[in-house]
Amino acid sequence: MSSELEALRQETEQLKNQIREARKAAADTTLNQAAVNVEQVGRIQMRTRRTLRGHLAKIYAMHWASDSRNLVSASQDGKLIVWDGYTTNKVHAIPLRSSWVMTCAYAPSGSYVACGGLDNICSIYSLKTREGNVRVSRELPGHTGYLSCCRFLDDNQIVTSSGDMSCALWDIETGQQTTAFTGHTGDVMSLSLSPDMRTFVSGACDASAKLWDIRDGMCKQTFSGHESDINAITYFPNGYAFATGSDDATCRLFDIRADQEIGMYSHDNIICGITSVAFSKSGRLLLGGYDDFNCNVWDVLRQERAGVLAGHDNRVSCLGVTEDGMAVATGSWDSFLRIWN
């Protein structure tokens, strides 16, 4: 048995090397070569326009509504808060059954928010009830590990990622898991839906990113390169690439059609992990939230740092860019959210 395993291991290594060679042969240029004549973006200087105060403990997650005005945040204080980003008013403050929340999401329709964490359950809350109060409309149990990330496809479907090494697609009305996405060999930490909603990418503690077909439940591509856990992942606006942030202190850009890593964003002075990543609307800038309390802004094409958003007094745990591209929100363990532009 062990000799068979050894032979299979060697065969896999050989196949991996063949794939590496094939990828190298296909890589006829580099991002640096392609971007050599691109204008520099100049120093990106953003100011904090709003500070959202109200959480009493570390903020773990945030997500903008599709109206680019409201946002939802989740904190260790056991509250989910829906904010009006223009006025800084709290639209809803939702007490959670479990305060160990790690992720939250806003439905595209604006009618629902979802959250989950160490309770292994994705809870869906209806914001548009007749009585005007917010209530749990559905709980989705089924994962055997913590819920690390969730994103709505529509009001009746949500995709989740979990510490049980899997992702899942749920039918919210029936409360059933319709598809399980298995293949990662470490906790899945983050997911991002493609702009056309047909695929999603996931990043995990096996240091790999995977691309999944939502309809047939299959892993279509696997991307390696990181040297440690991938904490965050986000699609490029056109859907042909995605970026990741890792504990190895780098963000990386992967091209889906080229099937490989094409860019890396790092600096000798940055030695801490990345918690969150987001692209500007055009895709020219990549924002990363770091354990050292900063948010770095990278020029995607030239692979150089273009700015820093400094202002939090603790780890930046989450960030998001509005759909209209006009503002960035950062959330932190200092219990505050800041809106920049």
UniProtKB/Swiss-Prot annotation:
Keyword Transit peptide attributed: no
Locations listed in the record: Cytoplasm
GO function term, MF aspect, one: calmodulin binding
Tissue occurrence: Abundantly expressed in gills, gonad and mantle and at lower levels in digestion gland. Not detected in muscle.
Protein name: Guanine nucleotide-binding protein subunit beta
Function per UniProt: Guanine nucleotide-binding proteins (G proteins) are involved as a modulator or transducer in various transmembrane signaling systems. The beta and gamma chains are required for the GTPase activity, for replacement of GDP by GTP, and for G protein-effector interaction.
Organism: Pinctada fucata (Akoya pearl oyster)
Transmembrane feature ranges: none
WD repeats: 54-93, 96-135, 142-180, 183-222, 225-264, 269-308, 311-341
Lineage, top ranks: Eukaryota, Metazoa, Spiralia, Lophotrochozoa, Mollusca
